[in-house]
Amino acid sequence: DTIFGKIISKEIPSTVVYEDDKVLAFRDITPQGPVHILLIPKVRDGLTGLFKAEERHIDILGRLLYTAKLVAKQEGLDEGFRIVINDGPQGCQSVYHIHVHLIGGRQMNWPPG
């Protein structure tokens, strides 16, 4: 299991900002902006990263993005925010349980790096 599995099972504490039956959202412990929240599916179902997505994952992928919008609104990010999914070694993915980064609260730059 990954660290996210332990966060879902409450073995490891986190600062939860949103939770429903499918998605858990919590503050990143190394924030890259004033607001930095991770959104994860509660059930991994083989979805370790976006490249591993299959047709059966369409609903949860959409749910993650819609939940990111809900959390952004809850966090007051009306002026904008960034959504990031790091995928695979070259994408700097560090935990192999798909997760969405919601980053905001400051002016973002482009290109990101």
Curated annotation (Swiss-Prot):
Transmembrane segments: none
GO molecular function: adenylylsulfatase activity
SUBUNIT field: Homodimer.
Sections of the chain in a coiled coil: none
Pfam family, one: HIT
Protein name, entry field: 14 kDa zinc-binding protein
Cysteine-cysteine disulfides: none
Organism whose genome encodes this protein: Brassica juncea
PANTHER family according to UniProt: HISTIDINE TRIAD HIT PROTEIN
UniProt motif Histidine triad motif: location: 97-101
Location of the HIT domain: 3-113
